[in-house]
């Protein structure tokens, strides 16, 4: 159910970031922050971490471990080429911090705005 929605949000976000479109990326962050529940926001974070790990695996020339479907192959390969080596590690760490903060009732809007900025800067 949420897979398609989450993939759309993630690809829109990462495409905006690699295109250096900060406004577009921040708009994506607002859309994610507006997901109807904290559980759904956390589920998106888990999904996004998995996507970032797939990008990392492809960067490491381990596509078989990444388990990327045929239709998503081109997208992940393109992102792997666009993202620096440290981007994946930093981003997964930042996403984990967001999940912890969601549990502490911190404003989602602030959290996802901050996450987008950090992703943008760490590219």
Residue ranges and their predicted role:
Residues 1-47, 51-123:
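Charged, glycine-rich active-site and insertion segments that engage polyanionic ligands
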């Amino acid at each position: 159910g949420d897979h398609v929605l989450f993939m759309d949000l993630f690809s829109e976000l990462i495409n905006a970031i690699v295109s250096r479109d900060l406004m577009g990326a921040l708009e994506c962050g607002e859309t994610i922050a507006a997901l109807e529940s904290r559980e759904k926001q956390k589920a998106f974070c888990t999904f996004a971490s998995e996507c970032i790990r797939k990008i990392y695996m492809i960067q490491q020339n381990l596509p078989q471990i990444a388990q990327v479907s045929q239709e998503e192959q081109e997208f992940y390969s393109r992102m792997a080429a666009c993202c620096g080596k440290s981007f994946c590690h930093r981003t997964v760490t930042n996403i984990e911090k967001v999940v912890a903060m969601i549990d502490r009732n911190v404003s989602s809007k602030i959290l996802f705005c901050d996450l987008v900025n950090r992703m943008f800067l760490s590219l």
